[in-house]
């Protein structure tokens, strides 16, 4: 499996804002000429001139700048879920916290030389934000330029395919059952360096599939093509899947939600992970 050349093509770095807006269908060449004339006559920046003429919005300019600097985020017209706040509102306070978490994980866990590229996102119960954190962490890692893969290993209640609006026809379950291949890894078109492997069809035996040697082999293969691999998991207090995944990933990040998570459940899951020889990276 070698998705690198197909999934990691950066094309807008160094291009002018006008060219990006034309390619995106936000400007016609004739409108761009009007903007350039005003820019030259008034000594204005291209974006300011375009907005003054009413030809584009401030959001259009921000979008073009994000592509110019290889820091992509999505417009409100995108088909992906608005739960991906890191993709829609990359400068909001909640995303600043996600970037701070990203920095801590880069310092404390992810290390290519030590072959630490994979991290399971775990929590004891449903509704604690595992899928939200996994998805948005994947976005902010990709915005850093890290080749990022998000695997939906919650084969009980998969969500990532709906968040990213990707096909769930082939995914992790088919791959572990020997019926899937590289096509199960899907690029997220508008986000550089981000790919998703959805859960696939809900199988009758998720725990058995995850316990097979093929899962470890799959992670090893994917680690050759990605810098960061994040794995969404089922509720740890309900199923043993999370512990199995965390051991295969070697490390786990515990998610807790204020006024929802119970300390006793968090401590119990943490103890189970450590006993199973998984490293608890943080919470």
Predicted regions mapped to residue ranges:
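Short, charged amphipathic recognition helices of the HTH superfamily
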Residues: 45-46
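P-loop NTP-binding module
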Residues: 2-42, 52-283
């Amino acid at each position: 499996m070698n998705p690198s050349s197909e999934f990691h093509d950066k094309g807008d770095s160094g291009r002018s804002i006008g060219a990006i807006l034309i390619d995106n269908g936000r400007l016609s060449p004739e409108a761009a000429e009007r903007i350039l004339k005003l820019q030259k006559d008034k000594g204005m920046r291209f974006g300011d001139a375009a907005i003054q003429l009413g030809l584009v919005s401030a959001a259009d300019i921000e979008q073009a700048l994000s592509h110019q600097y290889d820091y992509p985020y999505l417009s409100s017209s995108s088909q992906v879920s608005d739960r991906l706040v890191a993709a829609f509102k990359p400068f909001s306070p909640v995303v600043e916290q996600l970037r701070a978490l990203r920095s801590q994980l880069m310092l404390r866990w992810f290390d290519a030389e030590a072959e630490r590229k994979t991290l399971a996102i775990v929590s004891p119960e449903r509704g604690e934000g595992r899928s939200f954190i996994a998805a948005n962490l994947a976005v902010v890692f990709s915005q850093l330029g890290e080749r990022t893969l998000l695997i939906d290993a919650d084969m009980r209640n998969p969500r990532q395919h709906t968040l990213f609006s990707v096909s769930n026809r082939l995914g992790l379950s088919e791959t572990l059952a020997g019926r899937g291949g590289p096509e199960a890894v899907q690029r997220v078109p508008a986000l550089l360096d981000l790919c998703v492997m959805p859960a696939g069809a809900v199988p009758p035996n998720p725990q058995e599939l995850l316990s097979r040697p093929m899962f470890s082999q799959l992670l090893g293969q994917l680690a050759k093509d990605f810098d960061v691999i994040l794995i969404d998991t089922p509720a740890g207090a309900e199923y043993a899947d999370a512990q199995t995944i965390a051991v295969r990933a070697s490390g786990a990040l515990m998610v807790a939600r204020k006024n929802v998570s119970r300390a006793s459940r968090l401590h119990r899951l943490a103890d189970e992970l450590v006993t199973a020889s998984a490293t608890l990276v943080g919470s």
